[in-house]
């Protein structure tokens, strides 16, 4: 399966509550991609749908040109790090953001500018050198 992720008109409901309604996005292979939003807006729900842990009530999910709506989680060949374990307590904010790039063997001279851009985008550049236990929320 291709590493590109394509989502068209994703819908997820929990009873009468609609958690996602018509979400569409394209994540290109190798793209540095982040889901940002307030608590309860559907970020984790969408990730769980991509990973195959949550059912899909509507829309189409693709890895490359292969539709994966009915592909079981164990056959999707992807991983998911759950929220509580996604941050390394011994690393700074900057190093936590850089971790995924280093793990993918991105050249060192490209990592700092990409991390700086991501921190600036989410307006936390001033927190770059703090450890997780020095942050709130």
Annotate the PLM regions:
Residues 1-137:
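ABC family nucleotide-binding domain
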């Amino acid at each position: 399966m291709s590493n590109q992720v394509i989502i068209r008109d994703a819908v997820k409901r929990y009873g009468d509550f609609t958690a996602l309604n018509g979400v569409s996005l394209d994540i290109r292979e190798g793209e540095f991609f982040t889901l940002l939003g307030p608590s309860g807006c559907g970020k984790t729900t969408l990730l769980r749908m991509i990973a195959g842990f949550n059912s899909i009530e509507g829309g189409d999910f693709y890895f490359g040109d292969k539709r994966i709506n009915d592909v079981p989680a164990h056959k999707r060949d992807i991983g998911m790090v759950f929220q509580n374990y996604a941050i390394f307590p011994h690393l700074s904010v900057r190093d936590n953001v850089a971790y995924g790039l280093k793990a993918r063997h991105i050249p060192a001279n490209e990592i700092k500018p990409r991390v700086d851009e991501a921190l600036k985008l989410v307006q936390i550049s001033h927190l770059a050198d703090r450890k997780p236990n020095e942050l709130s929320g």
